[in-house]
Amino acid sequence: MSVPTVLEKILARKAEEVAERRARVSLAELEAQAKVADAPRGFANALIAQAKLKQPAVIAEVKKASPSKGVIREIFIPEDIAKSYEKGGATCLSVLTDIDYFQGSDLFLQQARAACKLPVIRKDFMVDPYQIVEARALGADCVLLIVSALDDVKMAELAAVAKSVGLDVLVEVHDGDELERALKTLDTPLVGVNNRNLHTFEVSLENTLDLLPRIPRDRLVITESGIVNRADVELMEISGVYSFLVGETFMRAENPGAELQRLFFPERGVAVSGSTLD
């Protein structure tokens, strides 16, 4: 028997987690919570509007740890990070809620969203409609669907549930086959290309550039992972990509918002130096 990959382990645990949560809070209870949650802030619209101006539309990630890197940020205060990102020019936030592998929390999402006016995506491994309704109940504005973690039927089902509760969907692909499946199955305008190879964990920005010609112009391409310096940003912008999801680069900086501004808006100077993280 082959050894399970990290993704397979995560998905197996996620199925158990959903069962545990459903035993504590019924779907009907969650649906009632979702109906009275704060109105969605328009995750997709915010990104599209910024990218149309040919300005960086940055999804800034609130992430404490990862399976491959361990703890990335020791002093981790979601409210302060969110405020810092907002001052630095982020368009949206991404908050990790996976507990077992990323040391995330539902509470982190609620804290980050309450501290700013930015739309927020729940970054987790979505495998069940329960999690989608739960995301809206928590106040999320968007959910992530990872093609490598889902078959086409499940992907379509989760997207339909997201639409029914007012959530936007960001679909994440790693290669051409996954891109083809995503475009065939979903009509979401947000297509994220992860530059990290799931098998080797190596990162190459060429992944986004290679897939770019195959993505229809009515979809917004978001490059994920591997943006570490101005040259990376400029390479993407020259290629027509203005949307970015960045986590680790910001999380390792003393002031995440200042690092965001330095990387994406250097012409603005040091306006965020007075943030709560100085």
From Swiss-Prot:
GO-annotated molecular function: indole-3-glycerol-phosphate synthase activity; phosphoribosylanthranilate isomerase activity
Family recorded in the similarity comment: Belongs to the TrpC family.
The protein's name: Indole-3-glycerol phosphate synthase
NCBIfam families: PRK00278.1-2 (NF001370), PRK00278.1-6 (NF001373), PRK00278.2-4 (NF001377)
EC number of the protein: 4.1.1.48
Broad EC category: lyase
Pathway the protein takes part in: Amino-acid biosynthesis; L-tryptophan biosynthesis; L-tryptophan from chorismate: step 4/5
Matches recorded under Pfam families: IGPS
Catalysed transformations (reactions): 1-(2-carboxyphenylamino)-1-deoxy-D-ribulose 5-phosphate + H(+) = (1S,2R)-1-C-(indol-3-yl)glycerol 3-phosphate + CO2 + H2O
A GO biological-process term: L-tryptophan biosynthetic process
Keywords: Amino-acid biosynthesis, Aromatic amino acid biosynthesis, Decarboxylase, Lyase, Tryptophan biosynthesis
Record's keyword annotation contains Lyase: yes
Domain of life according to the entry: Bacteria
Entry keyword Amino-acid biosynthesis: yes
Provenance organism: Pseudomonas fluorescens (strain SBW25)
